[in-house]
Amino acid sequence: MKTKSLFLLFALFITTALAACRPTSNSNNASGVSVTDASGKQVVVSDSSCIISVGTANTETIYALGAGSRVVGVDNSSAEYIEESAQLPKVGPRATLSAEGILALKPTLIIANADAGPPQVIEQFKASGVTTLVLPSNYTVETVKVKVRTIARSLSLEAKGEELANSIDHDMQEANALLNRAQSKPKVLFVGRGPNMPNATMSGTGTTIDEMIRLAGGVNPMSEFQGFREMTDEAVVNAAPDLILITQRSFERSGGIEGVLKFPGVALTPAGKNRRIVPVTDMYFQGFGPGVGRAVRELVIKFHPELGAGTQPAPSSSSGGEQR
């Protein structure tokens, strides 16, 4: 009975998605527009009325451009962290996509990053005739703006894309103006614990977190490894972080400050002794998206208390919806 109910629910998702895939005057360009993908090749997009978006930053960008109504399926992380896409069909984790499930939604355009996969599935999308736009997956502010402009052009929304890219510049200018006033250079250790993870982990280099720490004027003391590792007493104590950074969900899951102080070594660090454990919204570390400048500005304020309590984070901008 449960299996039958799940099947009917998935069928309803697909039916709804297919009904939404009707080209509109502003999403169907008969001659097509040409955009450059991560490999430097030109991709011609002639119909963007029915989009599968893989990657939270890509999904965030599409909604920020006001084209959320064109999205008919997203990866699991997008569904989890971007409220507007929570009820859409999920196509799996970005690194383990299934061609059958995605192609069943009859997309006209698939947008993903270069780290999506497996590679053979991406090739299946292309071989099936579905326009597939693969974007860079490196973590820099300049890459964010390139991706915003590329996605906007692929959706025939270039003016909105330019406006969004300019807003990123403005947000980063505000963040850097604050940073220029800062006098400290704190060692910032990012830690976390997933819902199904028995042990807490910490971030090394080569992650969105590492780059965000750098942009906000901090120093990641875990520079000897890439990616993530389980926390150990010795590594954390030797790192001697001034501040512990953690996502809000992980903070709550761990039992707040008292729970984080029980993570390996934390209580013996300057951050632990001074209770400088700072939770931030999870979206900050879900890939660089158009909100990167606002996120950096808030982190600058949290990292550098000498800037003063009166310095407030900039308000978040809301994404508009495109009307059909």
Map each language-model feature to its residues.
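Bacterial Sec-exported substrate-binding components of ABC uptake systems
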Residues: K2-L6, A19-T59, A159-F190, L243, ...
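Bacterial N-terminal signal peptides
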Residues: L9-A17
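Structured C-terminal subdomain patch of bacterial secreted/periplasmic proteins
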Residues: P23, T143, R149-R153, E162, ...
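Short helix-initiation/N-cap motifs at beta->coil->alpha
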Residues: T36-A38, P89-E100, N138, F225-D233
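A short, structured surface patch at a secondary-structure boundary
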Residues: C50-L105, L109-A114
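Alpha-helical, coiled-coil/dimerization segments enriched in small aliphatic residues
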Residues: N76-E80, L88, T201-F228
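Short helices/loops that flank or line small-molecule/ion binding pockets
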Residues: A99-K106, T232-A240
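Extracytoplasmic ligand-binding site segments that recognize negatively charged/polar headgroups
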Residues: P118-V121, L133-T150, S184-T208, E252-G255
